[in-house]
Amino acid sequence: LALAAAQVASSSASPPLIELLTFGVGSDPFSHFGHAGICLRELGLPGGQCMNFGTADFSTPVPLTLGFLRGEAAFWVSVLDRGRTIDWYAAENRTVERQILPLSNAEAAALLSALIAAAAPEMRYYRYHHFNDNCTTRIRDLLDQAIGGRLSATTKTTSSGKTFRAFIEEGFKDHVLLLALSHLFIGRAADRPASEWEAMFLPSAFRDSVERIMGARPETLFHSSRIDVPARVPTGHLAILSYGTIAAFLISVSRTKRYGAWLRALLVAVPGLLGLGAGLIALYAIQEELVWNEALLVITPLEVLALRTDRLGRWWRRGRVGLFAVIALLGAGGVLLQPLWSSLIAMTLILGALEIARSPKAQRA
């Protein structure tokens, strides 16, 4: 790489081919948003090397996740053989696209120098952030610097037309449980609109912006057989609503069953534990999108109070439903940003069923 940079710096040398590779989504959660790499090839020759800014120790998911929550997840850049890189992603049945970057000699030299510096032992590690500092934004920033800010000049002030949460929902569209959990665990910072520049944390958005601004058309090197179904139905919200409806029904009929008390406790424990999890994440994490979570107004570890049969339990159930009405009004007025409607309806159904089951008339029955 250093030799190539020195050659390009001279006016008589032809720059190497610099390619942006975009890899499609995979089957595991770490690959739901795709991936990007940047490769160097000598003109007219096979082979080449790729730089991967998304290298991490994925064999230890628990420490990696805890590090992510604290903003301490260590990622690094690795240099790999181009052919082996493409073959690996093809074997994973992930689409591979390339864009040859139309760079002048000076721009190619600047980009090569920046890539070499980024791969140096003292610079190769960085603290990963899904939106702000990932495998794609690292390449985006180096490329933008090399071409004199042409990528950022217009995209930083142009809206992508979507929020960060919308991008998350697209990435998790095939996984109902992850979608439902994202509604409960990811906070209000994800509901602000993303600029086109910010949207380039996604490899596909970066690919599209590079094509539009630099004229680098994507070429498909491998096409995945995976069927891409557009996300039209809010399945995460439907999952939350389904749980609330089923739980309310079971609570309504459980008062005549022998183990009704245990069943009611179990059904109420689920949102309580989810609230506990969301609260612990908010306390432990440092990322803004995980700390300020409006869903904690709807699900809390104190939901077990709704099981009480005394005055405190009655006040809790009725007070919570009243609070839900206020939350709905604040959401409609734009004060609260998160899409809380499914959890509000689900918890209202559950607390309403408990209130009916705990009424004196129902107890006598």
Label every model-predicted segment.
Residues 14-95:
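Glycine-rich catalytic cores of cysteine/serine-nucleophile enzymes that process amide/ester linkages
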